């Protein structure tokens, strides 16, 4: 395989769809640095591994000498992306957006080279557009065209409201590509309508239309739904090394390969080698450990990755308790507290319903003994180690 073909294969790694692939090949063969754009609306202060799928792809282009533009949608963040939503998304304030944007910059530079990354804000050109410019932009498309979007179509069919400003979101995202003169835009498969809008607007402005490279949405820890904080199935890149290690080790062996393809920087040949080793009898757990250590080293450091590995071995294979276990005191009103309420108050579960479910599954323990009675009452004056699942521990004194 030639160097060019090898580089192109790496750029295609994990991609769900490229529109148009032949265009991308032509652009790459010119040998000129291309402008590669990916936009992120700072709707929450922290990123999770699902967000890094696109950032990793930016890194691949960056390593090949292309100009990477990390676009922070401070303007679009105040509109609220309607993609995949069945209700109008709550818009953020300017202050919220800018505060979140600062944390984004800190986090993405754990992956991208800051010296070779352009950080742009789409308010730079959108604020200058003004009311007249926004109306002119709105005239570029029809309501019928906007209703081709699946989410809008479903909401209309179900009698759910669609706010007028939501129609502006894909137009603004498309105009970002015009303002940046993007050669390539990266996005998730759920963004296809918006990404293609960029091509349409660039054509109408006499620009060469951007190539669209779409990446899949990373499945969360459950292996079914996309990774999302609201679903609780995420791995945050600011998670502690211990939490990150435990979460990665909890994924299925099948999902592990998906994470290797989309999150690991290891060459595909090396990953295929892992598969061969497992076919020949290697324990998949050991391969999963390598993935966990690689990701923790990226977002923390090598020492943290090794320490998290050592703690995992001690806790789950040797039965040791974690060194950083929180110590809590829970005060009762009448000298006793129900086990479900205690676990909720200690933050080991999100609700009493979660507590009952974990007890039923045999996942709640007191001093390493399974709790089998959901009506168990804990008396004041006792101290014990409470555990829920494999990763949540607390030494709790009831008073």
Swiss-Prot record:
Xref: InterPro entries: aa-tRNA-synth_I_CS (IPR001412), aa-tRNA-synth_Ic (IPR002305), Rossmann-like_a/b/a_fold (IPR014729), S4_RNA-bd_sf (IPR036986), Tyr-tRNA-ligase (IPR002307), Tyr-tRNA-ligase_bac-type (IPR024088), Tyr-tRNA-ligase_bac_2 (IPR024108)
GO molecular-function term, one example from the UniProt record: RNA binding
Annotated ranges, domain S4 RNA-binding: 337-398
PROSITE patterns: AA_TRNA_LIGASE_I, S4
Biological process terms in GO annotation: tyrosyl-tRNA aminoacylation
Entry GO terms, CC: cytosol
SUPFAM superfamilies assigned to the protein according to its UniProt record, in alphabetical order: Alpha-L RNA-binding motif, Nucleotidylyl transferase
EC number: 6.1.1.1
Enzyme class: ligase
Residues bound to ATP: 229
Pfam families, per database record: tRNA-synt_1b
Organism the protein comes from: Colwellia psychrerythraea (strain 34H / ATCC BAA-681) (Vibrio psychroerythus)
Name this polypeptide is given: Tyrosine--tRNA ligase
């Amino acid at each position: 395989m030639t160097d060019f073909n090898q580089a192109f294969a790496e750029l295609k790694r994990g991609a769900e769809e490229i529109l148009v692939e032949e265009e991308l090949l032509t652009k790459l063969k010119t040998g000129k640095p291309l402008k590669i754009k990916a936009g992120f609306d700072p709707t929450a202060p922290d990123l999770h591994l699902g967000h890094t799928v696109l950032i990793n792809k930016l890194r691949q282009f960056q390593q090949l000498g292309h100009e990477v533009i990390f676009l922070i949608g401070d303007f679009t963040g105040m509109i609220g992306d309607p993609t995949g939503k069945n209700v109008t998304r709550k818009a953020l304030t300017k202050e919220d957006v800018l505060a979140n944007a600062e944390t984004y910059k800190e986090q993405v530079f754990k992956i991208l080279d800051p010296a070779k990354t352009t950080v742009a804000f789409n308010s730079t050109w959108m604020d200058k557009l003004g009311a007249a410019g926004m109306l002119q932009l709105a005239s570029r498309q029809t309501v019928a065209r906007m209703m081709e979007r699946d989410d809008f179509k479903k909401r209309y069919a179900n009698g759910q409201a669609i706010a007028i400003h939501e129609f502006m979101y894909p137009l603004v995202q498309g105009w970002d590509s015009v303002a940046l003169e993007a050669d390539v835009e990266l996005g998730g498969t759920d963004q296809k309508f918006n990404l293609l809008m960029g091509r349409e607007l660039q054509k109408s402005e006499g620009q060469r239309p951007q190539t669209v490279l779409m990446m899949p949405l990373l499945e969360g820890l459950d292996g079914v739904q996309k990774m999302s904080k609201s679903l609780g199935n995420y791995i945050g890149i600011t998670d502690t090394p211990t939490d990150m290690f435990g979460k990665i080790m909890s994924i299925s062996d099948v999902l592990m390969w998906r994470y290797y393809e989309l999150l690991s920087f290891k060459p595909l040949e090396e990953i295929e080698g892992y598969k061969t080793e497992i076919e020949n009898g290697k324990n998949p757990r050991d391969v999963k450990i390598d993935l966990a250590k690689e990701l923790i080293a990226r977002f923390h450091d090598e020492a943290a990755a090794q320490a998290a590995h050592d703690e995992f071995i001690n806790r789950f294979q040797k039965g040791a308790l974690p060194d950083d276990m929180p110590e809590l005191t829970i005060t009762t009103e009448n000298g006793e507290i129900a086990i479900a309420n205690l676990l909720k108050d200690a933050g080991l579960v999100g609700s009493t319903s979660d507590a009952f479910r974990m007890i039923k599954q045999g996942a709640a323990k007191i001093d390493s003994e399974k709790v089998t009675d959901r009506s168990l009452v804990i008396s004041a004056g006792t101290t014990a180690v409470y555990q829920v699942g494999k990763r949540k521990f607390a030494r709790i004194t009831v008073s």
